[in-house]
A protein has these predicted regions:
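Membrane-interface "cap" regions at the ends of multi-pass membrane proteins
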Residues: 1-33, 62-67, 71-84, 88-92, ...
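Helix-loop-helix connectors at the membrane interface of multi-pass transporters/channels
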Residues: 2-5, 79, 112-141, 242-245, ...
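Membrane-embedded translocation segments of transport machinery
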Residues: 2-8, 12, 170, 174-322, ...
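Inter-helical loop and helix-membrane interface segments of multi-pass membrane transporters/permeases
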Residues: 6-9, 38-42, 77-96, 109-166, ...
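Select transmembrane alpha-helical segments in multipass membrane proteins
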Residues: 11-22, 46-50, 88-102, 148-153, ...
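Transmembrane helix-boundary motif of multi-pass solute transporters/channels
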Residues: 14-54, 236-239, 250-253, 257-260, ...
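Membrane-water interface regions at transmembrane-helix termini and the short interhelical loops
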Residues: 38-42, 68, 89-104, 137, ...
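A generic transmembrane alpha-helix motif of multi-pass inner-membrane proteins
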Residues: 380-402, 424-458
Length: 458
């Protein structure tokens, strides 16, 4: 075991900086366009209850494990795994955690570009055009427009990364996260007070046992896994920036609260509004881009103050996209810094080039490159399938094996005690990391692949 302290490594200023940055990484597009849909589909309050229980057990364990490994080694994923031995599977575990953000952030930035386009159009007072049938399809088919929006989002993200951990990531997160919370509350209050919206509130929050099945558990498990930024290299990287006096367990709890609160607010923003618009038809709810870029503009167009609400909503979504994209980009940049020895600026430039190349494939994949498909998928869908459905569950499994088979619980406990003096949920952590988390991860892997291939519907 070769663990060396890197005293020259960048760091967050303290607990608040880490929590807001990690929460920003967790609060992303998935909270807004996937959580409400799944909650409505799988029993409302039952789904919420299962989600919270999983976040307090499965999510807690994985966040603590990755954060502790990062702080213990003071390295990004590749170096962190390699610190515990030279076996090939350790190297594989580190590299798969490192590659995932490199593949995700390009197509994530494409979607961020779409958000910029819609925000600008609402600011210009063109909400009526956004609500027209076919607008979104026409927009993403226009290679020039989507590419320009994508590049703007990339440059904004890279500019923040250039500024560093404290002056860039932490400073932006400290501004955007509180604003994001305020916006989500304002929009949720407005949404639930619309005529006919209370039916949607009941549908979202009141348990519906008729809709409960084991797929409810699987869906909640998958959403929690992807929502908390587990297995993306982010938490290992951010853990390596965490000061020794920061309490890992307390910080983890705060991140979980932030993430779950925003997800619930997203449900209260979207489900009641869609119900009010559709007359209570739950089939109107969709997941993914269709919900955000087709259904929501139609809903806003039929609401009073639709333009103002549209501006606030897409500003909220933009902040969520930015805080997640800077976390993904930072994880990639950190790997280049650690493994090749590049400066932050040089590493950021090279990651930016990768973002532009891979992101352009996704950006143009619905326009000039629409005829190009791999295993029946557009580029954006392909990258999403490879990372979310295949690589992330494997990366999480590698982390479970690293902690339970190589590092050991005692070392993790020693690291956690640096900041708080006690490992309060040690028993839960031990049972989860050794026995339950690996099984959950394998279930997520199997269900995600089956869903992507159309064998099941989630």
């Amino acid at each position: 075991m070769d663990i060396q302290n890197n005293n020259n490594r960048s760091s967050f200023s303290g607990k608040i900086g880490y929590v807001l940055s990690a929460a920003g990484a967790s609060v992303g597009l998935g909270n807004i366009w996937r959580f409400p849909y799944l909650a409505a589909k799988y029993g409302g309050g039952i789904f919420l209850l299962i989600y919270i229980l999983l976040a307090l057990t499965f999510g807690y364990t994985m966040i603590v494990a990755e954060s502790a490994i990062g702080r213990m080694t003071r390295k990004s994923p590749v170096g962190a795994f390699r610190s515990f031995g030279k076996k090939k599977w350790l190297s594989f575990g580190g590299w798969i955690n490192a590659i995932i953000p490199v593949l995700i952030v390009p197509y994530y930035s494409v979607i961020g570009g779409w958000v910029i386009k819609y925000l600008v159009e609402y600011v210009k007072g063109n909400g009526k055009n956004l609500a027209k049938d076919g607008y979104f399809t026409d927009f993403i088919s226009n290679g020039v427009s989507t590419e320009l929006c994508f590049i703007v989002f990339c440059l904004f993200t890279l500019g923040i990364i250039f500024a560093g951990v404290q002056n860039g990531i932490e400073r932006v997160s400290k501004i955007m996260m509180p604003v994001l919370i305020v916006l989500s509350i304002l929009i949720a209050v407005y949404s639930v007070t619309r005529p006919g919206a209370l039916k949607g509130v009941r549908y979202f929050l009141v348990p519906n046992f008729d809709n409960f099945s084991w797929m409810t558990v699987v869906a909640a498990m998958g959403q929690m896994f992807y929502s908390l930024s587990i297995a993306m290299g982010i938490l290992i990287t951010f853990g390596s920036y965490m000061k020794k006096d920061t309490a890992i367990e307390d910080a983890t709890r705060n991140v979980e609260v932030f993430d779950t609160a925003i997800a619930i607010m997203a449900g209260l923003m979207i489900i009641p509004a869609v119900f009010a618009f559709s007359g209570g038809n739950p089939d109107t709810l969709q997941a993914g881009p269709s919900l955000m870029f087709i259904t929501i503009p139609k809903v806003f167009q039929n609401m009073g103050l639709g333009t103002i609400v549209g501006i606030l909503f897409f500003l909220l979504v933009l902040f969520a996209a930015v805080t997640s994209s800077i976390a993904l980009t930072e994880s990639a940049v950190s790997t280049f810094e650690d493994e090749i020895g590049w400066s932050r600026k040089k590493a950021t430039v090279y990651v930016g080039v990768i973002m532009l190349i891979l992101g352009s494939l996704s950006s143009l994949g619905y326009g000039p490159l629409a005829c190009v498909k791999i295993i029946g998928m557009q580029f954006l869908d392909l990258f999403d399938f490879l990372t979310n459905s295949v690589m992330m569950p494997i990366a999480a499994l590698m982390t479970c094996l690293l902690v339970s088979r190589v590092v050991g619980i005692d070392k993790i406990e020693e690291e956690i005690r640096h900041g708080e003096g006690a490992f309060r949920r040690k028993k839960i952590f031990v049972v989860m990391i050794k026995y339950i988390c690996p099984v959950f991860v394998l279930i997520i892997l199997a269900s995600s692949v089956a869903n992507a291939l159309g064998w099941i519907s989630m």
